[in-house]
Amino acid sequence: MPIKIPNTLVEELVRLGMLVMKDAKLYENLARKEDKELGQILIEKDVVSANDLLEIKSRLYHLPIVRVEEIQLNSDILKEISEEVVDFYKVAPFKKEGNVLKVAILNPEDVDALEALKFIASDKSLKIEKHVIDYRDFEAVQRNYRSLTEEVGKALELLSEEAG
């Protein structure tokens, strides 16, 4: 999937004086070349700190922040969004309260990710509550998601062997 450049975020960083448009274009090209999110590039190049970027995203998109230490993945959450969707769209469910699914999202401007969440919500009769998350925390959630998916898979294998 091609990297989606968050134009509203770029404009906000320029407005705040943290980035000049000429450099923004260079970083956008680098993000595409390295197949990384623009925010990751900006953090790696010390344009903005991870924490400042997260705070700016939260304020800009009017979304709460979620941190990895607040996330307790369990097998029920895995049923809501597949690992493939998590990896492809950079969204991760982290809590379900009634019919509200709380989801961490890296790029709230990614229309494809938002459409995927809308589809999932409609398909499962859920409401989606989006939260922004930083890159390091998202990677930790992905790792936990992967290991939990593997554990559930192994448990299902054992059950089918015992039943068979």
Please place each PLM-identified region on the residue numbering:
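N-terminal, intrinsically disordered, highly charged
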Residues: 2-164
